[in-house]
């Protein structure tokens, strides 16, 4: 069978289209985590969201009292405590330290942004600001052990194919009220970097 030169471009285009179709079919999307792993990830994201929801209360209290957002000595003491408790629960110490440091940084980012907004608005003191010792710390004290348990569940999952993409997708749904997503990104960075 003879082909004229004018048929070659058509055959080439057809062959190229078939090859591209085959290659596109070979691209694999990351597998979805199991339902059990999805539930573990969702639990962590809900806890991170609950912790970030405390940040505006802290910001209001510090706005009224004039206290600094940064409290390095207090943070260091808390970080040492939660890292030790995490290690006792079988969580890798550096993973726990990085994770809880990220929670502090995300919370401070929310506080800084609120203080900037209030300063720009010329905001005066809040009526009945939350008491950090009586109202806020008990919430954090309740969340911390749950975060440690969840961190223990996730430390082996974060390396499983498909977990990272699931985590990112669900985070935008479950971690809300954090301005433009920066506090969420900061809070979850240690889970993505493993």
Question: Each predicted region: which residue ranges?
Answer:
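C-terminal motif of bacterial Sec signal peptides marking the signal peptidase cleavage site
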Residues: 23-25
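Immediate post-signal-peptide N-terminus of mature secreted/exported proteins
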Residues: 32-70
């Amino acid at each position: 069978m003879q082909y004229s030169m004018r048929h070659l471009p058509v055959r080439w285009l057809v062959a190229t289209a078939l090859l591209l179709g085959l290659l596109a079919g070979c691209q694999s999307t990351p597998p979805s985590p199991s339902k059990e792993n999805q539930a573990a990830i969702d639990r962590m994201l809900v806890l991170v969201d609950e912790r970030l929801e405390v940040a505006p209360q802290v910001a209001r209290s510090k706005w009224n009292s004039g206290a600094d957002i940064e409290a390095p000595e207090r943070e260091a003491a808390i970080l040492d405590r939660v890292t030790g408790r995490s290690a006792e629960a079988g969580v890798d110490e550096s993973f726990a330290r990085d994770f809880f440091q990220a929670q502090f940084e995300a919370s401070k980012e929310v506080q800084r942004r609120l203080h900037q907004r209030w300063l720009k608005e010329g905001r005066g003191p809040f009526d009945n600001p939350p008491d950090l010792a009586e109202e806020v710390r008990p919430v954090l004290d309740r969340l911390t052990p749950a975060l440690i348990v969840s961190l223990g569940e996730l430390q082996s999952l974060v390396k499983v194919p498909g977990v990272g993409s699931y985590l990112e997708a669900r985070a935008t749904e479950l971690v809300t009220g954090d301005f433009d997503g920066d506090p969420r990104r900061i809070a979850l960075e240690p889970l993505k970097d493993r």
